[in-house]
Amino acid sequence: MLRARPRLRVLGPGDVDAVTRLIEQDPVTHVFVDYRVRLTRLEPRWLGGEVWGYDEGGELVSVCHAAANLAPVLSTPDSIDAYAGRALAQGRRCGSILGRDHEVAALWERLAGEWGPARSVRPRQPFMVLDKPPLVEASADVRRVRADEVDILYPACVAMYTEELGVSPETAGGASLYRARVAQLVSRGLAFAHIEHNEVLFKAELGPITPHASQLQSVWVDPRHRGQGLAAERVAAVCEAALRDGAPVVSLYVNEHNVSARRTYERVGFTETCRFATILF
């Protein structure tokens, strides 16, 4: 009896159930790709790219999101080889590679010769989760940002993005697109902030949301208010909202060198479960 050869293929709407079953092996860690699959139903016009699948013995064993972000999921050495081959054939279309540290490292090893040098390589990013009420009292000052406060929030979002990624989101005419993204987050109730006298002292967002997890991202504290131990209470407020809205787990990943942020998340009750890595272009 002949066995099906391992192969890479571009997935489509008919593969949604198989991808969902695969990701359910670790849905919290892979919340980003899970969210994208659920949101787009693997329709090419909504993906803005592709999702690749790798079959062994006729069974889907790994996937790789290949759009604005290149994100391997549950990959093996053979599937990494296949993903790298397709990525090299297409040329770089993504702004980053992200995922479990060992998977990203293996993929980047194969791509660096053609795609490098990267603008930034972040090889060790603790992936942390909170699956219980926060350990610190939530700040009453943090709330969802209103639609009429987008102008107030926007400068803080630009500052956070620039500080975190080393480049302004407004570069190369990107201001209108980034502003639209901020407005969309506000309209969906995913942007939180502590605002006083029309100034943002703290902000955070909830990014990918699935039935399994909600991901905390874009956390920022006004530099004038850092080092005062206030961030934990504000992060706790966002986490409380996420858990109250039905997410069983809140996740995040943070740069290893950002010791103050890691301590803040630990105070809130987050624990590390694995390591991520990110390659930025």
What are these regions (language model features)?
Residues 1-33, 133-171:
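Short amphipathic alpha-helix that is part of the acyltransferase structural core
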Residues 6-11, 21-27, 34-96, 200-214:
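Conserved donor-binding loop and adjoining core beta-sheet/short helix segment
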Residues 56-61, 65-140, 279:
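Acyl-donor-binding surface of acyltransferase catalytic domains
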Residues 57-58, 65-70, 133, 165-166, ...:
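Acetyl-CoA-dependent GNAT
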Residues 77-86, 217-223, 227-244, 262-267:
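Conserved acetyl-CoA-binding loop-helix of GNAT-fold acetyltransferases
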Residues 93-95, 248, 271:
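Short acidic/polar active-site loop segments enriched in Thr and Asp
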Residues 98-104, 223, 252-262, 279-281:
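Conserved beta-strand-loop-alpha-helix junction that forms the acyl-donor binding cleft
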Residues 102-120, 232, 256-274:
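Conserved active-site alpha-helix within GNAT-family acetyltransferase domains
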